[in-house]
Amino acid sequence: MKLTSREARELLENERENTKDDRWIEHCVSVGDSAGVIAQALCEKGINVDVDKAITLGYLHDIGKYNGESRGHVMRGYEYLKNKGYADEYANICLTHSYLNNDVTCTAGGGPKPEDNPFLTDFIKNHQYTIEEKIINLCDLMCPHGYKVFTIDKRLVDLIIRKGAYSNTQYHIKETYKLKEYFDNLLGYNLYDLFPKIKDNL
């Protein structure tokens, strides 16, 4: 079963009534809206991107936090969407959004041990990320709680302050900058130019 951005937003609002802390919903909305901006700009450059799907995936990526808990939200979100009958192309974002470079250890806040979740480790290693999924990877790393967009620099500092520094932190930071550069090169300009208000959050 497919999803539109409108339907994904309705899922979020339905969960707002049940969750203990709805800041994750604000974050999902920011990620989805920011993803739409980047996707539209890429389309204008002649790059094949599904704008509504990018927005949809952004809205859905943290749906596994519906119970107010961050721990385990990746698998919980995937199972939530699968149990509702939604296609893999939507459920997969719950698995992919936190991990860069096809590596479960390339994540913020210290990665899981690969042996702790063989399914997730194997999926991330072998999955061919779509451009929409890569956009969500980036936007997740630009959007804090609240309806804001940060530079990568500020957002990474925010993550380190909240989650701590670990043996994989340098690796994750390097891959984050590579991801932003990838989209800058596709656009032919600094993608921060798409977000005039980003300077307000410096």
Descriptions of predicted regions:
Residues T4-H27, L57-K65, L100-V104:
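Active-site flanking loop/helix segments enriched in acidic
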Residues R9-L12, G32, G36, Y78, ...:
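An amphipathic alpha-helix signature
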Residues E17-I47, L60, Y86, C106, ...:
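Divalent metal-dependent phosphate-bond-processing catalytic cores, especially two-metal-ion Mg2+/Mn2+ enzymes
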Residues V31, V49-K84, A91-N102:
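His-Asp-centered metal-binding catalytic motifs of divalent-metal-dependent phosphohydrolases/nucleases
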